[in-house]
């Protein structure tokens, strides 16, 4: 189920802030001390920003297309779209880059709209594999191109700052649809264009 544009209206701002105070007390802090008095409000406002993707439908960004493209039917690639997301298992940050390619089928979309699709899915609780598939499916369903390729690189704080504590590790996922999946040459051209492997820790 897509929870786009849905909010839990039964949970108030005050209740969300009280939940933060509970976590502060659980951690051993005093939420009434001066340095923490505004923390619950700030955390709730930050969450409103970090998870604003639940209030959007990414498909909406791809509704306006352009068909006057003078017969252009070759690969279109947008690479190094930076994103910030949060792991749904530990609520820890995921920071990385998204690379998108598609073969138009008579229409194209403004490149900023592809970046907005990425933002909309990233600003939710995610696992990288799911986000990769969601972005590819959104583009395929809305633009109906001959093929779509999505590659995501991500550094996961749930691995670098807790548990195994392995810094410098990045995860790479891909989703290929249509010609990108069926034709090795198209897939290779896309992967050559995006040059996967730039250190996401430099972001």
Curated annotation (Swiss-Prot):
EC number: 3.5.4.16
Molecular-function GO term, any one: zinc ion binding
PROSITE patterns named among the record's database cross-references: GTP_CYCLOHYDROL_1_1 (PS00859), GTP_CYCLOHYDROL_1_2 (PS00860)
Cited SUPFAM superfamilies: Tetrahydrobiopterin biosynthesis enzymes-like
Pfam families linked to this entry: GTP_cyclohydroI
Enzyme class, first EC level, given as a word: hydrolase
Pathway of action: Cofactor biosynthesis; 7,8-dihydroneopterin triphosphate biosynthesis; 7,8-dihydroneopterin triphosphate from GTP: step 1/1
One term under GO cellular component: cytoplasm
Residues given in the record as Zn(2+) binding sites: 87, 90, 158
Keywords: GTP-binding, Hydrolase, Metal-binding, Nucleotide-binding, One-carbon metabolism, Zinc
Catalytic activity of the protein: GTP + H2O = 7,8-dihydroneopterin 3'-triphosphate + formate + H(+)
A biological process from GO: one-carbon metabolic process
UniProt cross-references to InterPro entries, sorted A to Z: GTP-CH-I_C/QueF, GTP-CH-I_N, GTP_CycHdrlase_I, GTP_CycHdrlase_I_CS, GTP_CycHdrlase_I_dom
Subunit organization: Toroid-shaped homodecamer, composed of two pentamers of five dimers.
Similarity comment: family membership: Belongs to the GTP cyclohydrolase I family.
Name of the protein in its database record: GTP cyclohydrolase 1
Species of the source: Xylella fastidiosa (strain 9a5c)
Organism classification: Bacteria, Pseudomonadati, Pseudomonadota, Gammaproteobacteria, Lysobacterales
